[in-house]
A protein has these predicted regions:
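Bacterial Sec-dependent N-terminal signal peptides
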Residues: 1-23
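Mature catalytic domains of secreted/periplasmic carbohydrate-active enzymes
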Residues: 21-482
Length: 482
């Protein structure tokens, strides 16, 4: 029992540490007015889908990390006796990956119906397996060794991007800067020691330059062959120009980045190339402070307070980032509350689903998305095109403002809870004569009265007993004093 308490305490302290890191980070805006405008547009759409998918889904394991020789719980499994044999077995997963039930149009419809406005897909994760048709490697889903390569939708990145664009969603390319399959990153001359390049780029500059060129070439394939891409989401923050002494530095996800060498991937140059083909593209160079990190990405957590810069929480719906057998999904109530909490603090929610090895989603994922969509159809006015407004968060209340001078108060309902007859609101004042209505109920104007430092909403008994939406209710104020 004591050990369980210690583990629980460790997890709590880790979450607090990660939250503190995000709340204290420096944000450097992109100087381009066009990109600033696109970021503002992105802040309007609020809710997106992230998908981690690759051959690793066949084993139901954490994506890529099980071949990383680090002493971390998400890396090489304890059961592995021969690392190199295991790595070879892992790399052969592409030879049996055959997701014949892949239906991107079904995914796109489900995402749209859920109220999602953008998608980010893993075109390549750290293991280097390409889910797009790159001519710079044979380690790809369209390669002749992969049984799916003869399928008309073998280029799954293209199929996904086309399907989601057709439903009106933005599309984003997740791309891993490290590539553990590339002999120019993990050089077979040396054994890999951790997530980093396994040789000194300063000592072997030609090899490192080969890797930089390889990376740039693959990214430019995505820029030129896959239509308009709204977001480039670069992962692997340890691959960056070294500006501090070699050692460890905190990464946005909360663990330490073991930066063994200067790994200058020439990101400024790469972003210039991207924008020459995709002038409106938002670039997120995750966990690398600078103008190429157009917004910040707290990982699998929600910051404790308003953050004064563009940000997005990427959060797992259930299981892991990638598909896992017998995954347990988060309850719909929790996810709707989480979305409201994130938006009230100025962020976007990027909700992750890991497709299975046959190309399908969990049935429960569709159920959760249906419920989120039903809630947003009624209450989306409080979410989309909104911005945070003080007091942001107060107990069960979350606050947002519209661009028309209105404001929304989101009341988070606990399980089996009915709305109280009166709701005290502090720190926000309606204008004189302002009307308050409950979204989802026509003619549901409610009375309010000034009280203390705020006001009190009087909820009619009929509305309390029959709220128009489950999980959370929204009160819209026509005008507020700002």
């Amino acid at each position: 029992m004591r050990s369980i308490k210690l583990v629980f305490l460790f997890l709590i302290l880790t979450v607090l540490k990660v939250a503190a890191q995000h709340e204290g980070q420096t944000y450097i805006p992109d100087p381009d007015p066009l990109i600033q405008k696109r970021i503002d547009n992105w802040q309007d759409i609020k809710f997106g889908l992230l998908m981690h998918w690759g051959p690793y889904s066949q084993w139901g394991i954490v994506e890529s990390w099980s071949i990383c020789p680090e002493d971390e719980g998400w890396c090489v499994p304890d059961t592995v006796k021969d690392y190199f044999a295991y790595k070879k077995h892992y790399e052969n997963l592409g030879k049996t990956f055959n997701p014949v039930k892949f239906d991107p149009e079904k995914w796109a419809r489900a995402a749209k119906d859920a109220g999602m406005k953008y998608v980010v897909f893993t075109t390549k994760h750290h293991d280097g397996f390409c889910m797009f048709d790159s001519k710079y490697t044979d380690y790809k889903i369209t390669g002749k060794d992969c049984p799916f390569h003869t399928n008309p939708k073998a280029d799954v990145t293209k199929a996904i991007f086309d399907a989601f664009r057709n439903q009106g969603l933005w599309v984003g390319a997740y791309f891993s800067k490290p590539d553990w399959h590339s002999s120019d990153y993990w050089w077979p001359h040396f054994p890999p020691l951790d997530r980093n390049v396994n040789y000194d780029p300063a000592k072997y500059p030609d090899r490192w330059n080969n890797f930089v060129n390889f990376t740039h070439n693959q990214v430019m394939e995505l820029c030129t062959n896959y239509g308009k891409i709204d977001l480039f989401w670069f992962d692997g923050g340890w691959v960056q120009k070294q500006v501090a002494p070699v050692g460890e530095a905190p990464q946005a996800s909360g663990f330490s980045v073991k930066k063994a060498f200067n790994q200058d991937i020439k990101m400024d140059e790469l972003v210039t190339k991207i924008r020459s083909k995709q002038p409106e593209a938002i670039v997120v160079d995750r966990a690398v402070e600078g103008k190429n990190q157009n917004y910040l990405t707290p990982e699998n957590m929600v910051p404790g307070k308003l953050l004064p810069y563009p940000w997005e929480s990427c959060i797992i719906m259930g299981g892991g980032w990638s598909f896992s057998y017998n995954a347990k999904m988060k309850p719909s109530r929790d996810m709707i509350h989480m979305l409201a909490d994130i938006v009230a603090k100025g962020g976007n929610l990027l909700l992750n689903i890991g497709p299975g090895p046959d190309g399908t989603w969990y049935d429960e994922a569709y159920d959760r998305l249906n419920e989120m969509g039903a809630w947003l159809k009624i209450n989306g006015e409080a979410i989309y095109n909104s911005r945070p407004v003080a007091p942001y968060v107060d107990g069960k209340l979350r606050f947002t403002k519209g661009k028309d001078g209105s404001a929304s108060i989101i009341y988070l309902l606990a399980e089996n809870e009915k709305l109280p007859s009166e709701i005290q609101v502090n720190g926000l004042t309606p204008e004189k004569g302002a009307k308050i209505t409950m979204l989802g109920k026509k003619g549901s104007s409610v009375k309010w009265k000034s009280e203390g430092t705020g006001f009190k909403i009087v909820v009619p008994d009929a509305l309390s007993k029959a709220a128009p939406s489950k999980y959370a209710v929204v009160f819209r104020i026509s005008r507020v004093v700002l």
